């Protein structure tokens, strides 16, 4: 089907849905039609803008052929033609991007997990830096950042930390952060001034609701035990810590941050649900498009995606060859938008090649 025919078909569908909604339908039929109509609004607006520019270009070209036009009028028409011809490719690209298959998870909130990797205590300190960076970014975006669990080293580092980030389209912005983040810097304890390299792993999961993932009680094994602090000593006398295992998948979540067993269980279930949902998403994505495995956003957690070089003051994203020489703004202030927007644009460009 030609591109123009496809656009006409979408406009017809949108008009038919509008007529259907105006006809007084009710119940499930109304809900379904309303949802479809709302989903088409954005792409229809872009199609109409594209068609309008095409129509205006055709009119301008026809007008230019008329006999007896003075030079001033002819120059004005040629300027208009030039402007329209330059705008059409951009408008067409906007339509194609709007037509790309949507990731159902993009509109969801997210759970972010940061774990210290290779590099000992320096890796744990870097994990804490990353976790705080995402907290700053969430604040800049007006999202709600709720710490779920932190396992600290006692001297400022995090063995692992997780948080729930709530807001509109959070997952669509943060999903490209999944992977291995590497840091190069001189540790405070390094007397010779040598640069050390360490790493931390980031996992970003769409926060799943109960309607997304139904977890049966019979599929869960719940163990309770006493919470322990640094060095392994017990920090309370009740079995407040919780370990939940999802038997069908083998996915396990353990939490002991809260003094209440009930609160630990609720948080653990939230993380568990997100991990199961993400696992199902990954399987479906692989089945649907094996050809996209190596592309940005594959979510490969073993892939080294970004390096933070403190002596040089730079942050480099290896997937899109983007380097910014403003490490403090990125790390301390959470100014991640340049990376986020570039990664989204790159992902869209690669998807467009598949159309």
Swiss-Prot record:
What UniProt keywords are attached to this protein's entry? Cytoplasm, Methylation, Protein biosynthesis
Q: List, as start-end ranges, the regions of compositional bias called Basic and acidic residues.
A: 280-293
Against SMART domains, the record matches this protein to: PCRF (SM00937)
Q: Which Pfam families match?
A: PCRF (PF03462), RF-1 (PF00472)
One GO cellular component from the entry?
Answer: cytoplasm
Location relative to the cell: Cytoplasm
Q: Give positions of region: Disordered.
A: 280-306
Instruction: Name the InterPro entries for this protein.
Output: PCRF, Pep_chain_release_fac_I, Pep_chain_release_fac_I_sf, Prokaryotic/Mito_RF, RF-1
- Major subcellular location class: cytoplasm
Asked if the record carries the keyword Ubl conjugation, the reply is no
Post-translational note: Methylated by PrmC. Methylation increases the termination efficiency of RF1.
Q: Does the keyword Ribosomal protein apply?
A: no
Q: Which Gene3D superfamilies match?
A: 3.30.160.20, 3.30.70.1660, 6.10.140.1950
Signal peptide coordinates: none
Q: Which GO terms describe its molecular function?
A: translation release factor activity, codon specific
N5-methylglutamine occurs at 233
Query: What does the sequence similarity comment in the record state about its family?
Result: Belongs to the prokaryotic/mitochondrial release factor family.
- Entries under HAMAP family matching the protein: Rel_fac_1
What is the recorded function of this protein according to its Swiss-Prot or TrEMBL entry? Peptide chain release factor 1 directs the termination of translation in response to the peptide chain termination codons UAG and UAA.
The name under which this protein is listed is Peptide chain release factor 1
Q: Report the source organism.
A: Rickettsia africae (strain ESF-5)
- The gene name on file is prfA
């Amino acid at each position: 089907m030609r591109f123009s025919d496809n656009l006409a078909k979408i406009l017809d569908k949108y008009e038919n849905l509008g007529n259907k909604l105006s006809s007084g339908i009710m119940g499930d039929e109304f809900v379904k039609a309303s949802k479809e109509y709302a989903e088409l609004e954005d792409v229809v607006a872009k199609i109409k803008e594209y068609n309008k520019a095409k129509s205006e270009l055709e009119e301008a070209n026809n007008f230019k052929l008329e006999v007896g036009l003075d030079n001033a009028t002819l120059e004005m028409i040629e300027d208009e033609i030039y402007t329209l011809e330059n705008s059409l490719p951009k408008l067409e690209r906007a339509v194609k991007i709007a037509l790309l298959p949507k990731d159902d998870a993009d509109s969801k909130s997210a759970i972010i997990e940061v774990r210290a990797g290779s590099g000992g205590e320096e890796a744990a300190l870097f994990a804490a830096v990353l976790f705080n960076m995402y907290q700053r970014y969430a604040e800049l975006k007006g999202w709600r950042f709720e710490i779920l669990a932190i396992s600290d080293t006692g001297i400022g580092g995090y063995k692992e930390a997780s948080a729930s980030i709530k807001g509109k389209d959070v997952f669509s912005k943060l999903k490209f952060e999944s992977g291995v983040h590497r840091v190069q810097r001189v540790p405070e304890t390094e007397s010779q001034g040598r640069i050390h390299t360490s790493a931390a792993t980031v996992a970003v999961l769409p926060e799943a609701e109960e309607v997304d993932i139904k977890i049966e009680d019979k599929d869960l094994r719940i163990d309770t035990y006493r919470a322990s602090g640094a060095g392994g000593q017990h920090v309370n006398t009740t079995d407040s810590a919780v370990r939940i295992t999802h038997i069908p998948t083998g996915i396990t979540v353990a939490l002991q941050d809260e003094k209440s067993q009930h609160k630990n269980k609720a948080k653990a279930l939230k993380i568990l649900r997100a991990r199961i949902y993400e696992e199902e998403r990954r399987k479906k994505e692989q089945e649907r498009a094996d050809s996209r495995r190596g592309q940005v956003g594959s979510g490969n957690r073993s892939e080294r995606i970004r390096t933070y070089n403190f002596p040089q003051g730079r942050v480099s994203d290896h997937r899109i060859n983007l380097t910014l020489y403003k490490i403090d703004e990125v790390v301390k202030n959470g100014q991640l938008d340049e990376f986020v927007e570039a990664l989204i644009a790159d992902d869209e460009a690669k998807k467009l090649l598949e159309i």
